[in-house]
């Protein structure tokens, strides 16, 4: 064992450093104060700085890194196989290759924990805002769902429509407006204030759709990235959702709530409509689970233009139902649970916040 350690000393020291940092994080995350200090004093400012640097690049640096990582992994496999075949000590070569790959993956994970994972254990939006969330009564759920149905009907006529009645807003204009989305929330929630930049569009948006993703925040570059292939009616809330992550909000449910609220409060028609539509979808899904008859009664009040957008979205996402979508959701569900959230289903928990705020 000693000889093995000595022969691959650098790899083992790298492993020990990774394990030491990971252990320190796992211990420190038990302290809310330590996580607040880490996120507010170091990682959040660092990610914002990285985001400003990457803003100078016209394409998504995040996407470029994913492509490079995939190419690097393939090159590693090819060169690794060749090294094993040519080696006189194949078991040792395999050991070194596996240890090196494991170290690389562990280093990325440790950095992710520090740059982003700490936000799961720091003060949340609910903690900072003081918004009280209580169990949702069905009557209150129905009342707020009706409010959002009325809002989405009201805003449906404010945006351009295609021949089939579906949303036909300009994606470029939606993305360009992004830096202004949160401005009207700063007075009520001053801790959200920061300078925003438009999100980056993904060239592999179709691949994202196949995996069930509409956007993601990449902490290593500080970039917000959005899928631009899916129907654009809810693109504004996707943009707002990712920008809330940029503010250090880790919880998916809180980001969904903030996206709806920011869109409703902003001055752009496409964003207001998307906020009302997304809010209605979250609430209506919850109402359907609680009382299908009440859901049907609310559903019948929807404007045909709203129904056209719901149908367009349903038809688009139906084509991606399959193995890739199932696997990616299972992986992301496991990721969320590893940080103490309740998994992918926590997206629906934003209903509690919507009802608490709008009832």
Regions found by a protein language model. Give the residues of each.
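Membrane-embedded alpha-helical segments of integral membrane proteins
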Residues: 19-83
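N-terminal membrane topogenic signal
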Residues: 2-15
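Transmembrane alpha-helices and immediately adjacent membrane-cytoplasm interface residues
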Residues: 73-78, 92-126
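Pan-zinc metallopeptidase signature
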Residues: 305-359
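Auxiliary, metal-adjacent structural segments of Zn-dependent hydrolase domains
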Residues: 160-222, 228, 232
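Post-HExxH zinc-binding segment in Zn-dependent metallohydrolases
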Residues: 139-143, 250-294
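Membrane-interface segments at or immediately adjacent to transmembrane helices
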Residues: 117-187
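Active-site recognition of the HExxH zinc-binding catalytic motif
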Residues: 58, 235-256, 260-261
